Amino acid sequence: MLAFDFFGATEGGLFDINATLPLMAIQVVALTYILNSLFFKPVGNVVEKREKFVSNNIMDAKNKLSEVEKLEADLLSQLQSARYEAQKIVSEAENESDKLYKEALALANDEANASKEKARLEIENQTSSARDQLFKQADDLSELIVNRLILEK
């Protein structure tokens, strides 16, 4: 037959109130302490170190990213400045070459005009000289004709 005790459980059941219960409680506390000191603390320390490592790496990455962005902005600024300076130099060189071209063209035109004027004056002198010779020859010829006509009479 089954005998029931005051709490409704049979003897030798799952929960007997005797020395086993405090012993089990002491074992649970001891096991918790041992697991905590041998397993959970080292694992917790490793996890904390890993979190610190990851956190530090993230902070370093953010700092490096901001530094890279700053350097990129500086380099872009320098690039724009260099492009502006290059355009300015090219523009100045074009202006200088245009100026030199115009000066050379003006000098060539002046030389051409001077040569043309010199040639015109030389042609006028030669024409005048040729005209004078023709007039002199015409005078000589007319004098010769007049002298022959006078001699024939």
Curated annotation (Swiss-Prot):
GO terms for molecular function: proton-transporting ATP synthase activity, rotational mechanism; proton-transporting ATPase activity, rotational mechanism. It is found in: Cellular thylakoid membrane. SUPFAM superfamilies: F1F0 ATP synthase subunit B, membrane domain (SSF81573). It is a single-pass membrane protein. The chain crosses the membrane at residues 23-40. Keywords: ATP synthesis, CF(0), Hydrogen ion transport, Ion transport, Membrane, Thylakoid, Transmembrane, Transmembrane helix, Transport. It comes from the Bacteria. InterPro entries: ATP_synth_b (IPR034679), ATP_synth_B-like_membr_sf (IPR028987), ATP_synth_b/b'su_bac/chlpt (IPR002146), ATP_synthase_B_chain (IPR050059). Belongs to the ATPase B chain family. NCBIfam families: PRK07353.1. F-type ATPases have 2 components, F(1) - the catalytic core - and F(0) - the membrane proton channel. F(1) has five subunits: alpha(3), beta(3), gamma(1), delta(1), epsilon(1). F(0) has four main subunits: a(1), b(1), b'(1) and c(10-14). The alpha and beta chains form an alternating ring which encloses part of the gamma chain. F(1) is attached to F(0) by a central stalk formed by the gamma and epsilon chains, while a peripheral stalk is formed by the delta, b and b' chains. This is ATP synthase subunit b'.
